[in-house]
Amino acid sequence: MFQNNPLLAQLKQQLYSQTLRVEGLVKGTEKGFGFLEVDGQKSYFIPPPQMKKVMHGDRITAAIHTDKEKEIAEPEALIEPFLTRFVGRVQKKENDNRLWIIPDHPLLKDTILCRPANQVTHNFENGDWAVAEMRRHPLKGDRGFQAEITGYIIKGDDHYAPWWVTLTRHSLQREAPTMPDCQLDDGSLERIDLTALDFVTIDSATTEDMDDALHIVKNNDGSLKLSIAIADPTAYIKADSELDKIAYQRSFTNYLPGFNIPMLPRELSDDLCSLRPKARRPALVCQVSILEDGQLGDDMQFFAAWVESKFKLAYDDVSDWLEHQTGWKPESEAVTTQITLLQEMCERRNQWRHQYALVFKERPDYRFVLDKGGNVVDIVIDQRRSANRIVEEAMITANLCAAKILRDKLGFGIYNVHTGFEPTQIDQVVDVLKENGIEAEANALLELDGFCQLRRELDQQPTQFLDSRIRRFQTFAEIRPEPGPHFGLGFDAYATWTSPIRKYSDIINHRLLKAIIQQTEEEKPSEEVCLQLTERRRANRMAERDVGDWLYARFLHPHAGTDKTFSAEIVDITRGGLRIRLVDNGAIAFVPGSFLHAVRDELQCSQETGSVLIKGEAVHRLNDIINVRIEEVRMETRNIVARPVA
């Protein structure tokens, strides 16, 4: 009798229109239920049965119902799925020929029914790593989730899984590109012959892709004439050639623990373009005077040249000699002169940057030592020493010169731009500074000079607490086609060109500098190019982090549940607890709030104040050093959980 009843249809329509509907992101939990977060302000409970229709990270619309004074979200429509392409582990069930896959994500625990694509011929075993794409979703009207395996990665127990799984996840290449036919072609470019000069290369002892060499002399007026020779792969790589397209697609050499995957074929990066000792190589050279006060002279110039590095020197050897440690000595008077004058250049420039720009506080670099099977044997700290600082100052000088020449002659290039504080959050910065006894004006902090003045003041603080608190209000560095300030370095413009073997952005700037030298026209880099460079840089950094997390988990797993203690620095404070970095090896671990104090209502972990309060009293702050032991290492998610010890 209710069939085709217009009153009933009207009632249904009325109920539908009166029901609140919202759009938001699904946040899963390990307990089966979830939440729908709307604009970061409001969240609605999603009960376990309704969570079966969605995944963590899905963007959906949902109807909001009230049950016993509790607002509950009922998923209705999918706007954007969280999972599209993903990596995971294949699962097989007893007496069942079907395959399932578990996505490699800490909050995605459920198996997804899957089948291999037609072109995938691998016979999958339990635990194999695979890459898949989602094909079905309950909110699209399908009966359940289903995926299609588009590729086999590696066996589940293979020790090289961290590398191959991570590279596949981020759609990064696994091998060096093959070398196409290409010849050195300078066209009408004239090169000055500098092969008689005593250029030296300072690098790691094992480095093959050497892209810089240095030469320096002292002028009669006390200034230093510094020549920075940079390898010139653009002599071999013509714009829009096959090799150029390969370099553009990769954009950067990918440095991972244990090995690297080059942007260019190794025949170029490690041989034809590498500034090897006693080898004549095409180069682009920047020449500039360093005045006695460290300022750069007005005589900076760029030109193409032939150079021959006379000596390959190792960072540690040069540092040992400069720091008066016994052992290595320069092999000739020429090398001694070069090292001595380069050290003088470094001191002048570093002192000038401390006074007129900014110098980063040095942090240790952690390096994994691996055996041939990919096992972590040790994690060592590589400190930045005297020779590293020489090369760093020379490269910064070269990049400053390029930024100025490109700006003055063309008005464009590939620039690294960092604009300091986020303008919408500047009032919060002022408030935090005031709480800690520093008076500052918002407008001044948004200018380069004001930012630099604040940074120098923060460097004088007894701890890094205040620096860490305001760092989260800063913008991210960007790759831009126009000149712009780099607040982090304290410069009004900064453009890199010193690593063209490893960075496509530097190849672009090489071509622009050559256009200036030859007085020819060159197009401004497009926004599309800048976006490609940004995305590939981000993917490479995430890959390095992901492989590192995996290796840290393997390295620390034997210490889980033992009494071994580690010194750790608090690097972040969240509502749920502390993120810490183990001082000896650099591993990131999490300390849950329940490990800090048993009574939850008496504990407050505040990211805003950068402190942990128990009963209203601060017990921990950002950058504090605490002792911990490893409570648990969750190998499936590569998460390390630590517990404080007295």
Swiss-Prot record:
Sequence ranges assigned to domain S1 motif in this UniProt record: 563-645
Q: What is its EC number?
A: 3.1.13.1
Gene Ontology biological-process annotations: mRNA catabolic process
Q: Which UniProt keywords apply?
A: Cytoplasm, Exonuclease, Hydrolase, Nuclease, RNA-binding
Domain of life where this protein originates: Bacteria
Q: Which residues form the RNB domain?
A: 191-518
Q: Could you tell me which InterPro entries the record lists for this protein?
A: CSD, CSD2, NA-bd_OB-fold, RNase_B_OB_dom, RNase_II, RNase_II/R, RNase_II/R_CS, RNase_II/RNase_R
Q: What class of enzyme is it?
A: hydrolase
Enumerate the catalysed reactions: Exonucleolytic cleavage in the 3'- to 5'-direction to yield nucleoside 5'-phosphates
Primary localisation category: cytoplasm
**SMART domains on file:** CSP, RNB
Gene Ontology cellular-component terms listed:
cytosol
Q: Which GO terms describe its molecular function?
A: exoribonuclease II activity; RNA binding
Q: Which PANTHER family does the annotation name?
A: EXORIBONUCLEASE 2 (PTHR23355:SF37), RIBONUCLEASE (PTHR23355)
Biological function: Involved in mRNA degradation. Hydrolyzes single-stranded polyribonucleotides processively in the 3' to 5' direction.
* Family affiliation: Belongs to the RNR ribonuclease family. RNase II subfamily.
> Which HAMAP family does the record cross-reference, listed alphabetically?
RNase_II
Give the protein name, as stated in the record: Exoribonuclease 2
Provide the organism lineage as a comma list. Bacteria, Pseudomonadati, Pseudomonadota, Gammaproteobacteria, Enterobacterales
